[in-house]
């Protein structure tokens, strides 16, 4: 059956989203056209505005429509002396929701992966080096993912920080709150034992 070229284009465009295959794209397209045209128009406007105006913060590399994001511009954040290194911009949002960190960030946009041709420069470590040289940090917190690549990236950055005499810490990894030991994998359990701490009463 021959369908509208515009509908075909819409379905193909929706497939740019992660996890959306042909069937999902078809369902979304028909839903927007049949039941939610105003939502589709709003989506189109928001997508166009975001793609046109959102860039990267010159300091931390997160997404922002300004030259520098609100976190980097915040004087209170600047005074904290802490820098948290994360892999992706969405990691910042996850950390901010905890309310436990009041410093600034640096976004790698990935992790070291020599087999894929991703070296230090590809994840902005030259820019991080510049920040360590030109700004005053008393602690760098490494919040990369607990994967082989994340660990390798954290170790590389830790060495950079030591050269600049900056304290380096890594966020703890272990058993999730409410989790059961029998359901936890061996690697996570090993991290939990390695990161154990004293019980204060």
Swiss-Prot record:
Gene Ontology BP annotations: DNA recombination; DNA repair
Record bears the keyword Nucleotide-binding: no
Keywords of the record: DNA damage, DNA recombination, DNA repair, Metal-binding, Zinc, Zinc-finger
Domain Toprim: 81-176
Molecular-function annotations in GO: DNA binding; zinc ion binding
Keyword Zinc appears in the UniProt entry: yes
Residue intervals passing through the bilayer: none
ZnF segments: C4-type: 57-72
Pfam families membership: RecR_C, RecR_HhH, RecR_ZnF, Toprim_4
InterPro entries linked: DNA_Rcmb_RecR, Rcmb_RecR, Rcmb_RecR_Znf, TOPRIM_dom, TOPRIM_RecR
UniProt similarity note: Belongs to the RecR family.
PANTHER family: RECOMBINATION PROTEIN RECR
Function field: May play a role in DNA repair. It seems to be involved in an RecBC-independent recombinational process of DNA repair. It may act with RecF and RecO.
HAMAP family named in the record: RecR
Protein name stated in the entry: Recombination protein RecR
Protein species of origin: Actinobacillus pleuropneumoniae serotype 5b (strain L20)
Lineage of the species this protein comes from: Bacteria, Pseudomonadati, Pseudomonadota, Gammaproteobacteria, Pasteurellales
Gene: recR
